């Protein structure tokens, strides 16, 4: 009995750890998207104008993502918090 309890305890702990390690992709739309971005981006230092690359360079390096916005990536399909954080700053 002691072995089965120990096995169950190890199983539950490993299950909890693995679920916390995986980031769940969710959809964020409308007010929920705006509030989530505000919460995530609060305190993220914004870049000054000198740190921005010229327009023709940014279009070249952005590729297809340059044509999509946060709504395309996180409202029309699920996204992770890491994707939302990429829009901060």
UniProtKB/Swiss-Prot annotation:
GO cellular component: extracellular space
Signal peptide: 1-19
Subcellular localization(s) per the UniProt record: Secreted
Disulfide bridge map: 29-75, 41-88, 74-79
Calcium in keyword set: no
Gene3D superfamilies: Insulin-like
Gene Ontology terms for molecular function: growth factor activity; hormone activity; insulin-like growth factor receptor binding; protein serine/threonine kinase activator activity
One of the protein's GO biological processes: positive regulation of activated T cell proliferation
Family per similarity comment: Belongs to the insulin family.
Extra remark: Silk worm has two kinds of PTTH: 4K-PTTH and 22K-PTTH; there are many forms of 4K-PTTH.
Function: Brain peptide responsible for activation of prothoracic glands to produce ecdysone in insects.
Protein's name in the database: Bombyxin B-2
Name of the gene this protein is made from: BBXB2
